[in-house]
Curated annotation (Swiss-Prot):
Species annotation: Yersinia pseudotuberculosis serotype O:1b (strain IP 31758)
Function description: Component of the sulfite reductase complex that catalyzes the 6-electron reduction of sulfite to sulfide. This is one of several activities required for the biosynthesis of L-cysteine from sulfate. The flavoprotein component catalyzes the electron flow from NADPH -> FAD -> FMN to the hemoprotein component.
A GO molecular function held by the record: FMN binding
Name this protein carries in UniProt: Sulfite reductase [NADPH] flavoprotein alpha-component
PROSITE patterns xrefs: FAD_FR, FLAVODOXIN_LIKE
Sequence positions that bind FAD: 335, 369, 399-402, 417-419, 423, 432-435, 612
Cofactors demanded by this protein: FAD; FMN
Domain FAD-binding FR-type: 247-461
Keyword Transport annotated: yes
Length: 612
C-alpha cells in the first residue's frame, strides 16, 4: 500500500497553520496524541452554541503502543494484523514503525507490544537500530509502570536466531517493565504461532484494559517519508491499495537477462528487466522486488533418487494435495539448510557423523550453512518416506532484490541486479535457488511471479538540493542506479557522490557506461572506485571513505544524506566504523560523541542502510 499526500493547496490548512500544527505535535507523547485526537473529535461533534471545555473531556484512553521493527516486511504485516485485532476489540492502539518512534517517550508507556525481526548475525532490523541502541545505553529510563510483550521473528538457519527479539525482551525486563506474556521466537514459518500469539495478546489486554466506551483511537506516528509528495503531511492523502502482494504476486514477464560481469570475472552478475505490463504495480527507488521461483527440476530428481522415491507419492501442503515432486519443485525449500533440519535428520537417519556434529555448535552452524539438504542426504543416506521428507523441509520463501530502476525512467519495467550464487560440493555444481532460476532456467518472455516490498527506511531526501553520498560495493550498487535515474529525471540540483568497489576494474565495473555518462553530464558529482584485486594490497570502499574523510565530513556538514547498501556482516560494519572514525577525527569528537552523532543522523534519516 502506498500513500500520497494531496498538494498543499488542497489541504484545509494554510501553510502557516500546517507548520504550527507540525511543530506543536512534536512535543506530545503517543498517549497525549491519542487524547487530543478524541478531544478534537468531540469539538467537531458539539451541538451548535456549546462551549468546549477540556475539563469535561473524557479521560485519555489507555493506549497500547505497538512497535513494528521490520526488515523484510513480515514484522510490519504481523503488527498491522495485531493492530486490527486490537481495534476490533475496542482497544486504543498506536502503531508505529521503530524508526519513527520517539524512544525518549518510552518511560510514559503503560502497555507496550514489540514485533521485532532479526537481520544478519543477530542484529535488529535497520529501522530499530536507534531504539535498540538507546535501550542499551545509560540514557534508558527505568520502566516500572510499563507492561510489555515481544514477538521475535527470525530464521533458524542463522546462529543468532531471533536475537533482536530476545534483546528487546530481556532489556525491557531489566529496566523494570513487567511481561504481559512470555516472548515468542518464531522461525520462517511463523504464521500459526503468530495467530495464536495475537489471540493471547488481545485476551490479555482485554482483561487488563476495559474496552473504550467511544470509538477506539488509532494514532499512527507520522512516517518521515522522503518522497516529495508525502513530505508535506502523512494523513488525509489518497491511498492506492495494490491487488498484488507476497501472497498474491503479479505474474509478469522477463524481458531482459544480461550478464554484466566480464567473461574472466570470478562473479556472475546479471542485469534483469521485468515487464509489469498494464498491472499498475508501483514502486519507488529504495524498494525491493520479491521474486517467487521454482527449484531446479534436476535437483528435485536427484533428491528423489537418493531417497528411492518416485515423486508421485501424494502429500499435503497447507491443506492442498499434490504429488511429492510438485511440492519439492514449487513449495519447499531445497537450497537452504538449517541446524534444526540437521538435528531432525540426524535422528531419522541415525547417522553417527551427524549425531556427533550436534554436540559441536559452531561446526553444526557451519555445516548447515554450507551443506544443502540434498548433499546432506547424499552424505548420510536414509530411507525417508514422502511425509517424513515434507515434514523436514521448510516452505519455499521468495527472495528480495533491491530495485535498480526508477519508474520515472523505466515506466512499466522493474530492474534488479542479481549476483548468481554458484559453488561446488563434492564435485557437483550447485546454484542459488532464485538466482539460478533467474540466470539459468527462466526464459526471456517467460512468466515470473513478483511483488513489491516497500522500504520507507531507504528513501531519497525530499529536498532535491540535498547532497547524497552512496556507498554500494558489488550488487549493493543496485538501488543507487535507481537513485540516479530519479535524481536525473527530477532535475535535482543536489550533489551526488558514489563509492563503488569490486575485485577488478576490467571485469566487475557494473553499469560502467551509465556511471561514466552521469559523470560526464554532471549528474554524478564524484565517484570513488575500489578494486580489491587489481594490486598487491587489497583496497575496499571503506579505505576510499577513510582516504576522503575530510571531504566526506564537509559533505555531511552541508547536510548530505548517507546511504549504504550491500553485505551486512562485514562491509556495512566496516563502513560504519570508518564513518565513526571520520566523524571523530574531523568533527573533533571522542568515540562516544561520534557514536551519538551518527545515531542522530540515523534518527534524522540522514544515514540509511539497505543491508543483507
Amino acid at each position: 500500500m502506498t500513500t500520497q499526500a494531496p498538494p498543499t493547496s488542497l489541504l484545509p490548512l494554510s501553510p502557516e497553520q500546517l507548520a504550527r500544527l507540525q511543530a506543536a505535535v512534536g512535543e506530545f507523547s503517543p498517549t497525549q496524541m491519542a487524547w487530543l485526537s478524541g478531544y478534537f473529535w468531540g469539538r467537531v461533534n458539539q451541538q451548535p452554541g456549546a462551549v468546549a471545555s477540556p475539563a469535561v473531556a473524557a479521560p485519555p484512553p489507555v493506549t497500547v503502543t505497538l512497535i513494528s521493527a521490520s526488515q523484510t516486511g513480515n514484522a510490519r504485516r504481523l503488527a498491522e494484523q495485531l493492530r486490527d485485532d486490537l481495534l476490533a476489540a475496542q482497544l486504543s492502539v498506536n502503531l508505529v514503525n521503530a524508526g519513527d518512534y520517539k524512544f525518549k517517550q518510552i518511560a510514559q508507556e503503560r502497555l507496550l507490544v514489540v514485533v521485532a525481526s532479526t537481520q544478519g548475525e543477530g542484529e535488529p532490523a535497520e529501522e530499530a537500530v536507534a531504539l535498540h541502541k538507546f535501550l542499551f545505553s545509560k540514557k534508558a529510563p527505568k520502566l516500572p509502570e510499563t507492561a510489555f510483550a515481544v514477538f521475535g521473528l527470525g530464521d533458524t538457519s542463522y546462529e543468532h536466531f531471533c536475537q533482536a527479539g530476545k534483546d528487546f525482551d530481556s532489556k525491557l525486563a531489566e529496566l523494570g517493565a513487567q511481561r504481559l506474556l512470555d516472548r515468542v521466537d518464531a522461525d520462517v514459518e511463523y504464521q500459526v504461532q503468530a495467530q495464536q500469539w495475537r489471540q493471547q495478546v488481545v485476551a490479555t489486554l482485554q482483561a487488563k484494559v476495559p474496552a473504550q466506551s467511544t470509538a477506539p483511537t488509532q494514532f499512527i506516528a507520522p512516517t518521515q517519508s522522503t518522497t516529495p509528495a508525502a513530505a508535506a503531511i502523512t494523513s488525509g492523502g489518497t491511498t492506492t491499495v495494490s491487488p498484488y502482494s507476497k501472497t498474491a504476486p503479479l505474474t509478469a514477464q522477463l524481458s531482459v537477462q544480461q550478464k554484466v560481469t566480464g567473461r574472466n570475472s570470478e562473479k556472475d552478475v546479471r542485469h534483469i528487466e521485468i515487464d509489469l505490463g498494464d498491472s499498475g504495480l508501483r514502486y519507488q527507488p529504495g524498494d525491493a522486488l520479491g521474486v517467487w521461483f521454482d527449484n531446479d527440476p534436476a535437483l528435485v530428481e536427484e533428491l528423489l533418487a537418493l531417497l528411492w522415491l518416485k515423486g508421485d507419492e501424494p502429500v499435503s501442503i497447507d491443506g492442498q494435495n499434490m504429488p511429492l515432486a510438485q511440492a519439492l519443485l514449487s513449495h519447499l525449500e531445497l537450497t537452504q539448510n538449517t541446524t534444526l533440519i540437521v538435528d531432525k535428520y540426524a535422528a531419522l537417519s541415525r547417522d553417527e557423523t551427524l549425531i556427533a556434529l550436534l554436540a559441536d555448535k559452531p561446526a553444526l552452524q557451519l555445516y548447515a550453512k554450507n551443506t544443502p539438504f540434498v548433499d546432506m542426504v547424499r552424505q548420510a543416506p536414509s530411507d525417508l518416506n514422502a511425509d517424513q521428507l515434507v515434514g523436514l523441509l521448510r516452505p519455499l520463501t521468495p527472495r528480495l532484490y533491491s530495485i535498480a530502476s526508477s519508474q520515472a525512467e523505466t515506466e512499466n519495467e522493474v530492474h534488479i541486479t542479481v549476483g548468481v550464487v554458484r559453488y561446488d560440493i563434492d564435485g557437483r555444481a550447485r546454484s542459488g535457488g532464485a538466482s539460478g532460476y533467474l540466470a539459468d532456467r527462466l526464459e526471456v518472455d517467460g512468466d515470473i511471479r513478483v511483488f513489491i516490498e516497500h522500504n520507507d527506511n531507504f528513501r531519497l531526501p525530499a529536498n532535491p538540493e540535498t547532497p547524497v553520498i552512496m556507498i554500494g560495493p558489488g550488487t549493493g550498487i543496485a538501488p543507487f542506479r535507481a537513485f540516479m535515474q530519479q535524481r536525473e529525471v527530477d532535475g535535482a540540483s543536489g550533489k551526488n557522490w558514489l563509492f563503488f568497489g569490486n575485485p577488478h576494474f576490467t571485469e566487475d565495473f557494473l553499469y560502467q557506461v551509465e556511471w561514466q555518462r552521469y559523470v560526464k553530464e554532471g549528474v554524478l558529482t564524484r565517484i570513488d572506485l575500489a578494486w580489491s584485486r587489481d594490486q598487491a594490497h587489497k583496497i575496499y570502499v571503506q579505505d576510499k571513505l577513510r582516504e576522503q574523510g575530510a571531504e566526506l565530513w564537509n559533505w555531511i556538514q552541508q547536510g548530505a544524506h548517507i546511504y549504504v547498501c550491500g553485505d551486512a556482516n562485514r562491509m556495512a560494519k566496516d563502513v560504519e566504523q570508518v564513518l565513526l572514525d571520520v566523524v571523530a577525527l574531523h568533527g573533533a569528537m571522542d568515540a562516544e560523541q561520534a557514536d551519538e552523532y551518527l545515531s542522530e543522523l540515523r534518527q534524522a534519516r540522514r544515514y540509511q542502510r539497505d543491508v543483507y
